[in-house]
């Protein structure tokens, strides 16, 4: 008997009503491992090192697929090594950036939920607000650069890494908002929104995971955007100063004078209007199975050991209803993940494949009992939610956590990327790096 729910998208989104922001768009990014492999095969990092800091640079845009485990860092590295075996310099800088993702995952592994709070004392004494100003939430700050970044975030679910740092610096330092609020906004809208890279990068900008806070000036934005926004800007630019002047302005006292009147009336982002989520139907009768695979949203690949080694097990993906009600995703994020589920299920031989909505522990427990399953398989990941779900399931079932190969082995506490890179570069590159040290910029 085959039980496959991969073609029930409309019903799924009805059940997810209230768990997402916005609605369907004609040009959202397609998800799934098939699309990830297509993008990887088409990518040439030859000019990456030279253009990566420009917002029109030749970046890979593989990060959404890496974040959801549709591709692995090792697969990307090995593919490029094989494709360009005699041109190591071609991808050295790109591999360094892959290592940032590996580094941030190690940060999450080490700190867990601690990554949600300041990892270090702030390097300044400026107070921060827990409210995002309304003009920011509406993408109407009056600054063409910031509004352009917000338009890309809200409508496209993508921001170039340099633009992410600019916006984070703007929100934290020029508007005086806690980094956690910005990290939450990015998680909701970015296709690659996650805990590790996202929260650690925001802390790097704030200066709670770096030796000093990051900020930019007008020249920096202008130079790396080809004056895309500056040419049309008619307002007094808050970034138009040299770095010493901005440093004094931002960190010698309160940043409140740079906040608009809208900020005084701002509401927390979690007060955004939401619909009520309908409870899912009871799970229908299923063919018995002793093994159940829980596919979480960071392990969506048919090459993942967890599914590859268990072709006869039942497979389930659970949309985490409590988490999505607390922090709804943009519609395009859910559509991307749904694409990933469809693509995964089409490429798995397993006969029972389900997509469910609810509390993962409750739904997996109910499903396991329906199947008569005694063993639940999970792919390893440092996300605390994955770890905690596995721990709760162990109270009732045999849980097998399948190990995930990582790009590097680095036992020490991951405090600074520069120290990490000195130790792991040869693991990533296969040789000692030839280029100078790079900053996370």
Language-model regions: role of each:
Residues 1-96, 100, 110-123, 151-155, ...:
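Trp/Phe/Arg-rich N-terminal binding region typifying the photolyase-homology
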Residues 73, 91, 142, 159, ...:
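Hydrophobic (often cysteine-bearing) scaffold residues that line and stabilize catalytic clefts
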Residues 103:
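Active-site-adjacent helix/loop patches that line small-molecule binding or acyl-intermediate pockets
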Residues 118-135:
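Active-site-proximal, glycine-rich beta->alpha crossover segments in alpha/beta enzymes
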Residues 131-153:
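Helix-hairpin-helix/helix-loop-helix acidic hairpins
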Residues 150-182, 186:
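Conserved catalytic-core segments centered on acid/base and nucleophilic motifs
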Residues 190-258:
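C-terminal, helix-dominated tail/subdomain
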